[in-house]
Amino acid sequence: MDHLYVDEAHSYKNAFLYTKMRNVAGIAQNEAQKSADMFNKCQYLDEITGGKGITFATDTPISNSMTELYVMQRYLQNSKLQNMGLGLFDSWASTFGEVVTSIELAPEGTGYRAKSRFARFYNIPELMNMFKEIADIKTSDQLKLPVPEAEYETVVLKPTEQQK
């Protein structure tokens, strides 16, 4: 086998991140076994094909956090990340972003709490140029897919006795 085609590649986004960052929203500290298995296969194919043995297909490479972009790059551009000194997540994160702590309303709604998240981004053109080496990005305007007209209907109901 010298090439791996992976459809629905977003299913493998839960790869472990070696990081010193703790309690930062969007940075998972758990790993799915299937993601570890996929990473090992990608590493092997990169070695025997010179980085040309893997094709990922997905319409949602990034859905919840920037860590998902790093994970996709790690699968498909690991050698490049290593050569650039960005192989570890903390190096990648400090090059392309910053953790920002802000005060937010607590989920219970009874007070406030400090919440840290990977929220400020830097070097976006460089990051996008790297990502475009492995991604064929198409916008809805480029695809020109038919979009059905929406039919909106408002239905007003009286509350039940329990809801009052």
Label every model-predicted segment.
Residues 1-3, 31-64, 75-164:
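Inter-lobe coupling linker of SF2 helicases/translocases
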Residues 7-8:
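Walker B catalytic acidic pair
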Residues 11-34, 65-66:
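Conserved ATPase-coupling elements of RecA-like P-loop NTPase cores
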Residues 23-25, 73-77:
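Short, low-complexity, polar/charged sequence segments that are solvent-exposed and flexible
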Residues 68-71:
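A short beta-strand element within the Helicase C-terminal
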